[in-house]
Curated annotation (Swiss-Prot):
Binds as a heterodimer with protein bS6 to the central domain of the 16S rRNA, where it helps stabilize the platform of the 30S subunit. Keywords: Ribonucleoprotein, Ribosomal protein, RNA-binding, rRNA-binding. GO terms for cellular component: cytosolic small ribosomal subunit. InterPro entries: Ribosomal_bS18, Ribosomal_bS18_CS, Ribosomal_bS18_sf. The keyword Nucleotide-binding does not apply. NCBIfam families: S18. This is Small ribosomal subunit protein bS18. The keyword Ribosomal protein applies. Gene3D superfamilies: Ribosomal protein S18 (4.10.640.10).
Length: 79
């Protein structure tokens, strides 16, 4: 059986981390506009698959969001 590869060929878009692309050195928990981009409308942290962030930056992002929540800069849940 031979498969026609012309139908199934497409170029994958290369996943690029937002923080690596913009040369961010540190994620600050006081930067609410940046953190809001990575939170759902219900207040949950978006996964790496959705945001295309690397593991290093996803860990720092989660810590920054949690710190901002404890400092009452971001609500824990949004209604």
């Amino acid at each position: 059986m031979k498969f026609n590869n012309k139908k199934n060929t497409f170029k994958k878009r290369r996943k690029v981390c937002f923080f690596t692309e913009n040369k961010v050195t540190k994620i600050d928990f006081k930067d609410i506009e940046l953190l809001q981009r990575f939170i759902t409308d219900r207040g949950r942290i978006l996964s790496r698959r959705v945001t295309n962030t690397s593991a290093k930056w996803q860990r720092q992002l989660a810590i920054a969001i949690k710190r901002a929540r404890h400092m009452a800069l971001i609500p824990f849940i949004q209604q």
